[in-house]
Amino acid sequence: MSKDNTIQFDISESKKALTREILTEVYDSLIKKGYNPVNQLVGYLISGDPTYITNYNGARSLVRKLERDEILEEVLKAYLGIK
């Protein structure tokens, strides 16, 4: 590779992977504590109230690393099959 070529960095793929990883961990923690993870995550996304998410395994801290609008964006893209 020549030193004159510009390398393009795609942050969206790493952001998508991080969002998926965090949501999976939060989902698993909610399941282990006996909660309905979909209902709890929807409550959090709508209200912004982190108490919808358990502290178990640091799930609440993890989900707060992501912006709610970014989570919704990734979920919507996945639902619609948009890359």
Swiss-Prot record:
Belongs to the UPF0297 family. InterPro entries: IreB. It holds the Pfam family IreB. This is UPF0297 protein CKL_1325. Coiled coil: none annotated. HAMAP family: UPF0297.
